[in-house]
Regions:
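Conserved divalent-metal-coordinating catalytic cores
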Residues: 1-168
Length: 168
């Protein structure tokens, strides 16, 4: 931290005996990650969503598109092929939409590979052009899905400065 004059991310491994430092890099701090002013009296019809849990600071300028995978519609799909097709469609949109000018919003854990009911099955290449990756945890009865908090793609998201937002 002192040498880089910034907070750092450390990655290390342990074999049970020795601890190995794998990577050390400065965390990025740009104006876009600084707290943004929040309007006090925004009409409800102008709100896309509101959060009642912790959400990171900042602003994301120049958004032109929102790709929204409806959690109810996704949850109603019964065939694995249909669920996989949703991820493939997201991948095609990722290539077509202007880089860093769109938001991806969808149910559960983005990047789910085994149980695709847990979230949209994508690879990093299917989401790498987005400005924001937003995971929606929608309660079904007593069940509240556990979100990945970007862990499937964490280092890629950090390096590309793609914002991650969990929405409960």
């Amino acid at each position: 931290r002192d040498r880089l004059d910034s907070p750092v991310d450390l990655e290390f491994a342990c074999d049970g005996e020795d601890l190995y430092l794998l990577q050390c890099r400065a965390q990025s701090h740009t104006e876009e990650f600084a707290p943004a002013p929040i309007p006090r009296h925004l009409p409800r019809e102008l709100m896309l969503f509101s959060a009642h849990r912790s959400i990171s600071n900042g602003r994301v300028p120049d958004i032109t598109h929102i790709v929204y995978v409806d959690p109810d519609a996704y949850g109603a799909l019964s065939e694995r092929a249909q669920l996989i097709a949703v991820g493939e469609t997201v991948g095609r949109l990722n290539k077509l939409l202007p880089k860093r000018q769109f938001i991806l919003m969808g149910p559960g854990r983005w990047g789910s590979r085994g149980d695709v009911k847990l979230g949209v099955s994508v690879t990093y290449a299917d989401i790498n052009n987005t400005a924001v990756l937003l995971e929606i945890a929608k309660r079904k009865g007593n069940y509240l899905p556990e979100l990945s908090f970007g862990t499937h793609f964490f280092q890629d998201l950090v390096e590309a400065e793609i914002r991650y937002i969990p929405l409960y």
